[in-house]
Amino acid sequence: TDVKVPVENRVGEEGKGWTYAKGLLEHERTGLAGLSRSLVALEQLKGNAESITRGNGTLMDDSGYKAKIAELEIDLMATEYTELRSLASASAGEELGPESSILKLKGTEIQQRIQKLTVEASGVFASAWGDKPVGPYFSKGGMAGYLNSRYYTIYGGASEVQRDVIAKNVLGLTRSKTK
């Protein structure tokens, strides 16, 4: 509170720093959702699963794996529609709001689920390390990708923070104060 910043070095109006920071975070979170990357990755995953033989069919013939892919597609489509509504609002000059938290939360969780299903499709080959691929070509770096995806839900505001934003701004809930 005792910081002195020369007027010529200020960005925007005095006392509005947090408002500007929140606006930047909303845009950052929308981008971190990575929905276009997830759409491409999911299509690649489905193609890869079609190339893996399991029993008398492919991995995509496995009802359990197919159900996981279907759930992921549904979540991705619903999140994409949220993004499109958000973009339409922004195009109309409206501010982004808690939608950016929803997009960041759902988008990064979807990215993690894609990585997890890639590891599942790769089987033991996902753990292979080094420059020489072992097993299916897409399994190279599978486990590393999965483990690195853990931080997706941390940067740009941890998932717990996003849930708090959603609870407060969408659902009107407040945190109970325990003594």
Name each model feature, range by range:
Residues 5-6, 26-27, 51, 84, ...:
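Short, well-ordered loop/turn and helix-capping segments at boundaries between secondary-structure elements
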Residues 11, 31, 35, 59, ...:
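Hydrophobic alpha-helical scaffolding
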